């Protein structure tokens, strides 16, 4: 499996991908979370050579871990490339609703139509209580999945309660309202923190994530009042995520405190 060095399956799953499917995860370095065909190409060697792991899947994340969004053309280019090597394209869509809202287009336009073979369709990060849907977009790929699901202990005894959430999620475009709100809140937050002297914005804000650098001592004090993750401690970089239930008052309170701390640091 070839993926970005920032991908969730590489960084945040405790080695689950390698343990449970028995496949090597190979990574490519990327500054903005996106991978390109040139990045993938360096791992495409050793085919039919028993001493080398055999490349079979490229996994991309939409929205990426860096908050950036792939365009349909970028995805199509990757899909066409990997299919030429008889490989599959997987999309981690934990924040796929935010991507659809940002691109202002249906899911199909940047998944099925763009050549994605397997999609993990997320809802937990956009208001659902829990659960993901696995979508097989190429005929035949799901043939043995029900056995894999059972063996990997992913068949819940009341699976219908997980599935039922998607009915409400899609009804009246609730998913889109939630994702649009989340993205809009990120832009509002970006506007305010960008105006604070000493705050450095490190990535384009294309969805609901903001990556910024502030002095470590300021961040440590700020985290006593607001929860957010450190991202790259070497450059004192931190990640802010807005969500479906972020309020204007949350942004006002956070930026007011940050401004006060930066002024006195």
In which residue ranges do the predicted regions lie?
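Conserved PLP-enzyme active-site core in the AAT-like
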Residues: 1-203, 207-213, 217-221, 225, ...
